[in-house]
Amino acid sequence: MTDSITIALSKGRILEETLPLLAEAGIELVDDVKKSRKLVFPTTDPNVRILIIRATDVPTYVQYGGADLGVTGKDVLMEHGGDGLYEPLDLNISRCRLMTAGKKGEQPPAGRIRVATKFVNLARRYYAAQGRQADIIKLYGAMELAPILNLADEIVDIVDTGNTLKANGLEPRELIDHISSRLVVNRASMKMKHGQINPIIEKMSAAVERRRDS
């Protein structure tokens, strides 16, 4: 399978919303991901396999050729930097917002600010672009605790409904960007396997447009 195609996905919402789009490109999983501990899955197309990995690892696997294609959130791409990746398609799924947030009714300090986030590079660029000095604190989860315990003045995190912020006495402040999942392709694979990859992109793009028009 020298010309086989490897697609990197992550478990959760992105996987669930990507599988129907892949199905319209003729690619369906043979096994049930939820019932298996495997990380590499065959599909109904004998020349295509799917990797199930951490969401934050998808750009890295695609960049360095561990996978030819991948689906990941724009937030992850912004944090990763996108080097060595071709981003041909916004899949318009897993939509949310990347925002700053802090204690309800409180204003952020005028001077140096402490910010908790898992998006360290992204947050550093964002505050620098605003001309604000920020100490970025790396956390891996439960961002809402940081302002509550005075670990940070603000957080930078993904916001969907905003209910989690509200339940913890926080409120969204500034919108950094609208986020959705993107199809990314290894640049070398796009050249060497164009004949196999381009039809996948075209069929998924058509599926996205049909959903947009429905």
UniProtKB/Swiss-Prot annotation:
Its EC number is 2.4.2.17. It is found in: Cytoplasm. It holds the Pfam family HisG. It catalyses: 1-(5-phospho-beta-D-ribosyl)-ATP + diphosphate = 5-phospho-alpha-D-ribose 1-diphosphate + ATP. It is an enzyme of class 2 (transferase). Gene3D superfamilies: Periplasmic binding protein-like II. InterPro entries: ATP_PRibTrfase_cat (IPR013820), ATP_PRibTrfase_CS (IPR018198), ATP_PRibTrfase_HisG (IPR001348), ATP_PRibTrfase_HisG_short (IPR024893). Transmembrane segments: none annotated. One of its GO terms (cellular component) is cytoplasm. HAMAP family: HisG_Short. Belongs to the ATP phosphoribosyltransferase family. Short subfamily. Catalyzes the condensation of ATP and 5-phosphoribose 1-diphosphate to form N'-(5'-phosphoribosyl)-ATP (PR-ATP). Has a crucial role in the pathway because the rate of histidine biosynthesis seems to be controlled primarily by regulation of HisG enzymatic activity. Lacks the C-terminal regulatory region which is replaced by HisZ. This is ATP phosphoribosyltransferase. It comes from Marinobacter nauticus (strain ATCC 700491 / DSM 11845 / VT8) (Marinobacter aquaeolei). The lineage of its organism: Bacteria, Pseudomonadati, Pseudomonadota, Gammaproteobacteria, Pseudomonadales.
